[in-house]
UniProtKB/Swiss-Prot annotation:
Belongs to the LpxB family. Gene3D superfamilies: Glycogen Phosphorylase B. The lineage of its organism: Bacteria, Pseudomonadati, Pseudomonadota, Alphaproteobacteria, Magnetococcales. This is Lipid-A-disaccharide synthase. Keywords: Glycosyltransferase, Lipid A biosynthesis, Lipid biosynthesis, Lipid metabolism, Transferase. It catalyses: a lipid X + a UDP-2-N,3-O-bis[(3R)-3-hydroxyacyl]-alpha-D-glucosamine = a lipid A disaccharide + UDP + H(+). One of its GO terms (cellular component) is membrane. It comes from Magnetococcus marinus (strain ATCC BAA-1437 / JCM 17883 / MC-1).
């Protein structure tokens, strides 16, 4: 009997842990004696990961936060590198977390260890020239969006679109009528969902704007209902400390948990730019997208970011499916007008739903998904031969 396959893995976000677990679970069916060590979250640990650090320790956003945690991050990096040297794996799989992951991949490549990265850095949004540098660190790249592999076409890197995992996850637990009954909204009434973001900075910049938009809509259409979908990452205190006192009497229902249930019950959505726009697209909910950041950040971003669009549905379709309102244009007057258009013009809303359905179809995993691509890579490029 030959030796078991040995894989080192790095993941640092909850979403990355989910992706890694799905991939490793599939690989274990093909290589049942597989051994894994590295950095991961609870799902990876359940699959037998010999964990050297918790993924949460690498889930840091912001320059100041990274600087504060840098000694610990460096310790984790050096410990994993030392183990790669003492117990060389058959391959290293890194998932998202590009700053940490790609540095580790570069070191692994220097050690002669084959490298696989899951989730392409956003070279399509800014610094597309990075693609060549990224390619020099990797042997295989797994992409979530169908337009991403072409950015690596002239780099020599094998890049594959493998489908987006949210397609399988974006399934409501309730029917539209069941969700409306829970919310106390009649079948005849119209419901507008509000998703102001999953980060505290987004809540601080967008919540009041979104609530004042709802206020303007309600004054024009008193039969409207509103449901604000509170992200799991936002506490009640964080939400209500920026909720203006003057707007506490608005008929806005606040709900936590499965966003898909409340989206499926809604007729339109006002949403902060981010993953939530993709979740809404997969449900097929007509939406207006808002984006606000620090003015200096925006000016810098304008110089770096080359994409015409900010929302994922538009980026994937490469056309203006949904309305995007940025910075000063993301104001209650404009946003309420955009939403009224969606609510008053069912044919336009239906056309948007159809365009979003096409977006969803484009994200379905191909027959040769992540597990198949990596398995082929292990057998044909790494040269591993199962021993039984």
């Amino acid at each position: 009997m030959g030796r078991p396959l040995r894989i080192a893995i790095v993941t640092g976000e909850a979403s990355g842990d989910l992706l890694a677990a799905s991939l490793v679970s599939g690989l274990k069916k093909r290589f049942p004696r597989m051994q894994i060590y590295g950095i991961g979250g609870p799902r990876m640990k359940m699959l037998g990961l010999d964990s050297m650090a918790d993924a949460q320790e690498l889930s840091i956003i912001g320059v100041v936060e990274v600087l504060n945690r840098f000694p610990r991050i460096r310790t984790i990096f050096n410990a994993l590198l030392k183990r790669l040297q003492s117990e060389p794996p058959d391959l290293l799989i890194t998932v998202d977390l590009p700053d940490f992951s790609l540095r580790m991949a570069r070191k692994a490549k220097q050690l002669g260890i084959p490298t696989v990265h899951y989730v392409s850095p956003q070279v399509w949004a800014w610094r597309s020239g990075r693609a060549k540098t990224i390619a020099s660190y990797l042997d295989l790249l797994l992409c979530l969006f169908p337009f991403e592999p072409r950015y690596y076409a002239n780099t020599g890197l094998e890049a594959h679109f493998v489908g987006h995992p949210l397609v399988q996850e974006a399934v409501p637990s309730y029917s539209r009528s069941e969700a409306r009954k829970i919310l106390g909204v009649s079948e005849a009434g119209q419901l507008v969902a509000i998703m102001p973001g999953s980060r505290r900075s987004e809540i601080q910049r967008l919540l009041e704007t979104f609530l004042r938009t709802a206020e303007r809509l309600w004054k024009r259409r008193t039969n409207l209902s509103f449901v604000l979908i509170q992200a799991e990452t936002i506490s009640d205190q964080q939400l209500y400390e920026v909720w203006p006192e003057a707007l506490r009497d608005l008929p806005v229902i606040v709900r936590h948990g499965n966003a898909y249930n409340w989206l499926a019950a809604s007729d339109a959505l006002l949403v902060a730019s981010g993953t939530a726009t993709l979740e809404a697209a997969l449900i097929g909910i007509p939406m207006v997208v808002a984006y606000k950041v620090n003015p200096l950040t925006y000016q810098i971003g304008k110089q770096l970011i080359k994409s015409k669009f900010i929302s994922l549905p538009n980026l994937i379709a490469q056309s203006a499916i949904v309305e995007e309102r940025i910075q000063q244009d993301a104001n209650p007057e404009q946003l309420s007008e955009d939403l009224i258009q969606l609510l008053n013009r069912p044919q336009e809303a239906m056309a948007m739903r159809e365009a979003l359905r096409v977006v969803k179809q484009s994200l379905l995993p191909p027959t040769h998904g992540a597990v198949e691509v990596v398995s082929d890579f292990i057998l044909h490029k790494v040269g591993y031969r199962p021993g039984g």
